[in-house]
């Protein structure tokens, strides 16, 4: 008997619901999936094997390769004496009398017509009682193998003219919806959504071409792709709430929120240009643009300043757009990447919207009270935790970014209190000296795409910035602020060269490049609520 542990959760839930917990699999299928059992038997009666291996020549040429190779060759009604064996999934079946059938076969999202003409497949005697029954035993969704000569139909459609009956490779035992539109059902069975809606498949393929282009861009510029810990005692330097677990010895562990501190330690060790594409985890809410598990790319370059990183960022965004879309126009957006990206300075832009000159923006209680009073005056809802950093972030989002969503723009010179891992500077705005960070954020089409720093490499300065964060964590209850990382400060004591660091949310970039407004659409299995 097969153990219950080998059965899928879906099957087990059905068995439990129907009080059939003692049924073994073949009984389950015969009683509750009679249609599946009947089709398997019907195929067997015709001598059709259900799950055979493919022949050795089946994978040599795929449908996309044939389409590309013969795109501009062969005239209407011409058949070339070039034979191919192709595999794919049936997307539609049409008959013309009892001697002619047309199958549309999909390989990914590329479709090729296969024409079955009785006279080309065998003699009348050989095909007697076989041709139509064998074809009609197949249905939409089945995976098949076909062999024949390439040609073009009378209507001009590129086709394979079969010289033998199709070989069933794997039957589809459930009906494929013509068009699956229910949002919840699409993500409950994402594979069915991909089979029913070619757009879903195309979006996911585009996602991975974007990721591939990011890798290519950095590799061509001398960056080495690396891996850093995902599960550790530190969650990585980002301002976020981590997922916490423990090991077998009950020692606390977290899933990383960002790889930043690990990557900078690699730079200290001598790896001067590194990048990492990988998963991060933040124990936060789910909405149209946020998922607790997400993909990011972070890159660090020794002996590069912030201006150099801005230039590199513009080059990357244009490179990806050209690679994916073939031009510098972003899908579904009136965004033109040909022009230079606009630059907005954080404090002047905020002061302009408020029509006030802000006093020094620091971690003091006076500054916090000043900002809270501005929130009340502007009738903006306060953030959950009213640290100076959170207050400034929400105020800027609400007053400045809300009305600047079209053209690409760099936001620069954030207040120091918002960027504890960035180098600092002092700048005069009117009559007020403000401590600012050497940082930029890139916004395109309303999305925050990138965040970059000239990295703080003074261990004493970094220690004091961590201590200021500690106040927010302990006194103001900000559980998104990481605890001071003494190991990282110790690493800085060995000398981090002047370094520009950069992070990009890959999921949001994919949303931008594909014109999607919901993050679930560009994730293979949707957001966390569906997995």
UniProtKB/Swiss-Prot annotation:
Keywords: Aminoacyl-tRNA synthetase, ATP-binding, Ligase, Metal-binding, Mitochondrion, Nucleotide-binding, Protein biosynthesis, Transit peptide. Residues 1-18 form a transit peptide. Gene3D superfamilies: Bira Bifunctional Protein, Domain 2, Nucleic acid-binding proteins. It is found in: Mitochondrion. Its EC number is 6.1.1.6. One of its GO terms (molecular function) is tRNA binding. GO terms for cellular component: cytoplasm; mitochondrial matrix; mitochondrion. Its main location: mitochondrion. It catalyses: tRNA(Lys) + L-lysine + ATP = L-lysyl-tRNA(Lys) + AMP + diphosphate. Pfam families: tRNA-synt_2 (PF00152), tRNA_anti-codon (PF01336). It comes from the Eukaryota. GO terms for biological process: lysyl-tRNA aminoacylation; mitochondrial translation. Belongs to the class-II aminoacyl-tRNA synthetase family. PANTHER family: LYSINE--TRNA LIGASE, MITOCHONDRIAL, LYSYL-TRNA SYNTHETASE. This is Lysine--tRNA ligase, mitochondrial. It comes from Schizosaccharomyces pombe (strain 972 / ATCC 24843) (Fission yeast). The lineage of its organism: Eukaryota, Fungi, Dikarya, Ascomycota, Taphrinomycotina.
């Amino acid at each position: 008997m097969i153990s219950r542990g080998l059965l899928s959760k879906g099957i087990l839930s059905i068995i439990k619901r129907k009080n059939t917990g003692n049924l073994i699999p073949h009984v389950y299928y015969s009683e509750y999936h009679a249609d599946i059992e009947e089709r398997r038997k019907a195929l067997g009666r015709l001598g059709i094997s259900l799950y055979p291996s493919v022949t050795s020549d089946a994978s040599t040429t795929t449908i996309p390769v044939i389409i590309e190779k013969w795109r501009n060759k062969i005239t209407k009604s011409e058949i070339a004496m070039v034979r191919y064996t192709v595999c794919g999934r049936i997307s539609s079946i049409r008959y013309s009398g009892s001697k002619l059938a047309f199958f549309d076969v999909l390989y990914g999202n590329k479709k090729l017509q296969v024409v079955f003409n009785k006279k080309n497949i065998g003699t009348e005697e050989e095909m007697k009682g076989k041709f139509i029954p064998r074809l009609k035993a197949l249905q939409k969704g089945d995976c098949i193998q076909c062999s024949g000569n390439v040609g073009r139909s009378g209507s001009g459609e590129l086709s394979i003219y079969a010289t033998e009956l199709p070989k069933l490779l794997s039957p589809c035992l459930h009906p494929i919806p013509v068009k699956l539109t229910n949002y919840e059902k699409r993500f409950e069975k994402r594979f069915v959504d991909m089979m029913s809606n070619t757009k879903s498949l195309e979006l996911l393929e585009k996602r991975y071409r974007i990721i591939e282009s990011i890798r290519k861009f950095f590799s061509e510029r001398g960056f080495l792709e690396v891996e850093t810990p995902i599960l550790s005692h530190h969650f990585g330097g980002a301002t976020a709430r981590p997922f916490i677990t423990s090991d077998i010895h009950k020692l606390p562990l977290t899933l990383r929120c960002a790889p930043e501190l690990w990557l900078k330690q690699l730079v200290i060790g001598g790896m001067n240009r590194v990048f990492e594409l990988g998963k991060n985890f933040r124990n936060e809410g789910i909405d149209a643009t946020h998922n607790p598990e997400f993909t990011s790319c972070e890159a660090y370059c020794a002996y590069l300043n912030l201006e150099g990183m801005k230039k590199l960022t513009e080059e990357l965004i244009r490179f990806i757009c050209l690679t994916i879309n073939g031009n510098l126009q972003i899908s579904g957006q009136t965004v033109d990447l040909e022009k230079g990206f606009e630059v907005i300075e954080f404090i002047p832009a905020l002061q302009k919207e408020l029509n006030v000159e802000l006093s020094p923006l620091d971690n003091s209680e006076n500054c916090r009270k000043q900002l809270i009073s501005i929130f009340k005056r502007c009738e903006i809802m306060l953030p959950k935790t009213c640290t100076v950093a959170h207050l400034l972030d929400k105020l800027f989002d609400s007053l400045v970014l809300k009305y600047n969503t079209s053209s690409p723009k760099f936001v620069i010179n954030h207040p120091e209190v918002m960027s504890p891992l960035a180098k600092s500077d002092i700048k005069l705005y009117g009559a007020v000296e403000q401590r600012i960070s050497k940082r930029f954020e890139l916004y395109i089409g309303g999305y925050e795409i990138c965040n970059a720093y000239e990295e703080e490499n003074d261990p004493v300065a970094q220690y004091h910035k961590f201590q200021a964060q500690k106040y927010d964590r302990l006194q103001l209850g900000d559980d998104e602020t990481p605890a001071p990382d003494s190991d990282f400060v110790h690493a800085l004591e060995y000398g981090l060269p002047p370094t520009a660091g950069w992070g990009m949310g890959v999921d949001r970039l994919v949303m931008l490049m594909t014109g999607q407004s919901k993050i679930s659409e560009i994730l293979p299995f949707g957001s966390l609520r569906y997995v």
